[in-house]
């Protein structure tokens, strides 16, 4: 008889600990077993975290396991990463385990599901690498052959050939007997990148992992990967948890995108997880972007990442010309429409040449909020507290947080007035206006309302790629890595949407969005044109984006960050407290603040801010309050340790308040 410590598959903070069981079966760390649990001895799944342990209680009272799952098991590396995630993010063991395990049932023999079964493979042979690509690969190959863990940041302008560098690196890694993970920021991009990879490496070597797969598809892909049948995994951020062994490289394309930071529990950063896993395998991390995050670029300047620059587009295709349009002048001239005169005239010319147009607005819906003109009341979701967005097609107010729809009242619920009006502009309104201007043209829209699943996304992208759609209107989905050859014009309908967000990253996000969407123009050999409309066209985020000058933007932004002591010069830790009782949430947040102040080292320079109500709380009669800690570099782990200690106190006190840690959140409002 030997003894093992397991984590029970029971989603409760009060059972989030090790339980000791005995067994005479062949059980090892990472196995999934069935165990009798609690007084009723109900059979529960459990995960073996430690084997061959010395029991801390009388062996006579220790229960024995019932069985071992013959198909699914985790590796030592996965278990170790789960333990690290629990400490890092203040989550339950089970929260981390669920990231690594499949959620579904096996297919019947011979009926495995392939999420990319229709992919024929897009073969793109590069005749000759550019000198910049060749230099990049020489630098990366040295790390691959050296078998040491290293980190690279590829700063390459749009269409500079970063994907070819990725694929040749992966080929090198696979030739050395290791495996690879290729991540993209949006599920919408997996189809295009999968086609290219199948064309290069063959379907049998590729697996796909993302949250839009069915449970059966995800299970079957997980099993193929775990059995070693796939050497390359492609996916969105979920792919970083692929059950690969001997990982040689993890690549994050468009590394600056906020989607690499999970906004659900566990609130992990994909880069953090990648680095943790690669340390175990001595693999390399590659981050690629035309607009690297300020944090990543600063790490490159500090020597934490090796910087590789691709300054020229492949085949020396010129970068598109960017024009800034002052919408204040349009108003003075009497133009109150969505299109400036310049955007309209250029749209006509582009369509006459037989080229396509992309119109970008990072707001979906028809109108962005519904308000009473009499008293100013803004209609909000009764469950989430988020202002409702009007969707004309559905004639409803929609909460973009929980997805629920509500009939728009005829009278104001606050004052009884009939003056209910719709304000702001979303992609649905842009589509309607564009159809009025160009009724004979084929117009498509790509946002979360028109593309609710991977199949719909692929259909819209394919239609535009094949030239069946003349004008594509979209949110940030159209700005991320899509490669269209016949786009002659990109119009940014309003650059002020992201610029006016009350967040310290707003200028960075604006620069990135404008630069990335501009990169969709002129990829087929001809110089494209980008028209950016704004009421603040002199903002440095827009002027530097118009000049394709990342370095100037970075130099200006990093000075502001340093002066304001924002990341990368500090770390932000947001601690959320959620409860059905609002007073309990407030009180617990206040107690945490007081606890951290008592733990605080004199002179460490940390700021611990008072509890605030989150504007994004989800769930009926559920309240979320948070405290924010801004701590100097080097003190982050200390404060995470103290926060976890406070969480243990809550468990001991049987508190009903749930606590979550969010390290360097992408939004603090």
Language-model-detected regions and their locations in the chain:
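Intrinsically disordered, low-complexity basic tails and flexible linkers associated
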Residues: 22, 656, 667-669
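Long, charged, helix-prone linker segments
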Residues: 102-106, 660-668
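Inter-lobe coupling/hinge segments of SF2-like helicase ATPases
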Residues: 130, 148-231, 235-576, 581-586, ...
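Short, conserved charged micro-motifs
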Residues: 27-31, 582-587, 634-644
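Short beta-strand elements
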Residues: 599-614, 655-664
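Terminal, basic amphipathic appendages of nucleotide-handling enzymes
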Residues: 1-153, 159
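A common structural junction motif
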Residues: 593-602, 644-657
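Solvent-exposed, membrane-proximal periplasmic/extracellular interface segments of envelope transport
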Residues: 55-67, 612-614, 619-631
């Amino acid at each position: 008889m030997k003894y093992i410590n397991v984590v029970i598959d029971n989603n409760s903070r009060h059972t989030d600990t090790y339980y000791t069981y005995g067994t005479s079966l062949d059980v090892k760390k990472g196995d999934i077993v069935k165990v009798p649990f609690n007084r009723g001895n109900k059979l529960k799944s459990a995960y073996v975290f430690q084997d061959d342990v010395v029991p801390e209680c009388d062996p006579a009272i220790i229960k024995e396991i019932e069985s071992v799952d013959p198909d699914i098991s985790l590796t030592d590396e996965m278990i170790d990463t789960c333990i690290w995630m629990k400490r890092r993010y203040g989550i339950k063991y089970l929260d981390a385990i669920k990231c690594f395990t499949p959620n579904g049932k096996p297919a019947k023999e011979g009926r495995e599901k392939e999420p990319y079964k229709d992919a024929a493979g897009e073969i793109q042979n590069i005749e000759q690498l550019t000198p910049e690509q060749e230099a990049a690969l020489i630098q990366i190959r040295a790390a691959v052959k050296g078998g040491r863990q290293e980190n690279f940041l590829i700063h390459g302008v749009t269409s500079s050939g970063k994907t070819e560098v990725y694929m040749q690196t992966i080929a090198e890694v696979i030739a050395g007997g290791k495996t690879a993970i290729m991540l993209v920021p949006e599920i919408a991009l997996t189809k295009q990148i999968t086609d290219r990879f199948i064309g290069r490496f063959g379907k049998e070597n590729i697996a796909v992992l993302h949250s839009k797969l069915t449970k059966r598809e995800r299970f079957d892909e997980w099993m193929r990967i775990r059995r070693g049948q796939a050497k390359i995994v492609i996916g969105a951020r979920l792919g970083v948890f692929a059950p690969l062994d001997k990982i040689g490289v993890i690549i994050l394309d468009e590394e600056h995108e906020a989607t690499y930071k999970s906004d659900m529990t566990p609130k992990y950063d994909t880069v953090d997880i990648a680095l943790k896993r690669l340390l175990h395998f001595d693999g390399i991390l590659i981050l690629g972007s035309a607009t690297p995050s300020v944090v990543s670029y600063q790490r490159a300047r500090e020597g934490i990442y090796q910087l590789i620059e691709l300054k020229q587009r492949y085949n020396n295709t010129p970068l598109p010309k960017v024009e800034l349009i002052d919408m204040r002048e349009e108003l003075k001239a009497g133009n109150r429409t969505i299109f400036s005169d310049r955007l309209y005239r250029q749209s006509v010319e582009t369509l006459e040449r037989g080229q396509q147009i992309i119109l970008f607005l990072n707001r979906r819906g028809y109108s962005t909020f519904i308000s009473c003109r009499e008293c100013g009341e803004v209609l909000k979701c009764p469950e989430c507290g988020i202002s409702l967005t009007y969707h004309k097609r559905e004639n409803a107010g929609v909460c973009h947080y929980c997805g629920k729809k509500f009939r728009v009242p005829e009278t104001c619920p606050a004052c009884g007035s009939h003056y209910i009006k719709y304000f702001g502009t979303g992609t649905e309104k842009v589509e309607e206006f564009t159809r009025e201007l160009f009724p004979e043209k084929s117009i498509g829209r790509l946002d979360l309302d028109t593309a609710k699943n991977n199949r719909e996304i692929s259909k819209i992208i394919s239609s535009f790629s094949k030239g069946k759609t003349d004008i594509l209107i979209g949110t940030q989905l159209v700005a991320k890595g899509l490669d269209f050859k016949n786009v002659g014009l990109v119009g940014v309908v309003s650059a002020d949407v992201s610029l006016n967000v009350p967040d310290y990253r707003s200028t960075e996000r604006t620069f990135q969005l404008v630069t990335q969407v501009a990169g969709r123009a002129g990829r087929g050999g001809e110089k494209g044109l980008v028209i950016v409309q704004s009421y603040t066209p002199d903002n440095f985020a827009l002027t530097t984006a118009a000049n394709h000058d990342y370095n100037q933007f970075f130099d200006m932004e990093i000075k502001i960050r340093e002066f304001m002591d924002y990341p990368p010069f500090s770390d932000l830790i947001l601690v959320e407290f959620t409860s059905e009782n609002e007073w309990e949430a407030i009180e617990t947040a206040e107690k945490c603040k007081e606890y951290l102040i008592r733990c605080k080292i004199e002179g460490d320079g940390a700021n611990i801010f008072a509890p605030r109500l989150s504007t994004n709380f989800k769930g009926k009669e559920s309240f979320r309050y948070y405290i924010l800690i801004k701590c100097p570099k080097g003190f982050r782990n200390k404060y995470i340790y103290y926060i976890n200690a406070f969480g243990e106190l809550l468990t001991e006190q049987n508190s009903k308040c749930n606590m979550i840690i969010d390290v360097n959140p992408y939004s603090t409002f």
